[in-house]
Regions:
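Short secondary-structure boundary/capping segments within folded domains
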Residues: 14, 25, 56-58
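Solvent-exposed, charged/polar functional surfaces in cytosolic regulatory/catalytic domains
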Residues: 53-54, 117
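Acyl-donor (CoA/ACP) binding surface of acyl/acetyltransferases
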Residues: 1-20, 27-29, 70-173
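Short, hydrophobic secondary-structure boundary micro-motifs
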Residues: 34-36, 63, 166
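A short helix-loop-beta-strand connector motif used in the catalytic cores of GNAT acetyltransferases and
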Residues: 54-67
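Short, solvent-exposed alpha-helical surface patches in well-structured domains
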Residues: 22-25, 49
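Conserved GNAT-fold acetyl-CoA-binding loop/helix
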Residues: 31-53
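Secondary-structure boundary/capping residues
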Residues: 32, 60-63, 127
């Protein structure tokens, strides 16, 4: 599955075996661990097995990981639809874009493409994202993509020193 934005400046596609080095670099970016549920590095082997065992079927895996490619087909980020609940017609979204590719519209275009896919192919009713309130770029990304800040989860994330509040961002399709 490949999805291109209307300006043909970026593409979303399924994770491929040749993405292992890129996935390794993103998953082991310690700055991102605070917004996820990991606190240990992933090995190449573990990530290789993840790629090989993924069916790329959101109904089977309950998640879909997409690689964000720039106009030169270089991987610059990942967009995940996860905690997919077909019965309730919803999923969560997460996105990570390399620092060198941030603030160039790639993230917003990727989110818009994923929303279109969620609406037209998956027939979802809503997508939500949990965003650290201190993560201003991510808050702006989701707000500018049409998500609404509908709730706050107090002390939801812990970085080893401080608890952080999280915005529950929702987009109704």
């Amino acid at each position: 599955m490949n999805m291109k934005d209307s300006n043909m400046t970026m593409t979303l596609r399924a994770l491929e075996p040749e993405d292992l080095d890129f996935l390794y670099s993103i998953e082991n970016e310690t700055d991102m661990w605070v917004v996820g549920c990991t606190n240990v590095p992933y090995s190449y082997y573990t990530l290789q097995q993840y790629i090989l065992n993924s069916t790329n079927d959101i109904y089977a895996d309950k998640q879909m990981r997409l690689v964000i490619l720039d106009e030169n087909n270089k991987p610059i980020g990942l967009l995940d639809l996860f905690n997919f609940e077909p019965r309730h017609l919803r999923a969560e979204m997460g996105i990570a874009v390399k620092k060198t590719a941030q603030n160039q519209g790639y993230g917003q275009n990727a989110v818009k493409l994923a929303i279109k896919y969620a609406k037209n192919i998956l027939h979802l009713h809503q997508i939500c994202a949990l965003v650290d309130l201190d993560n201003i770029p991510s808050m702006k990304l989701f707000l500018n993509s049409g998500f609404k800040h509908n709730a706050t989860l107090k002390h939801w994330l812990y970085d080893g020193n401080t608890f952080h509040d999280v915005a529950v961002m929702q987009f109704f399709l």
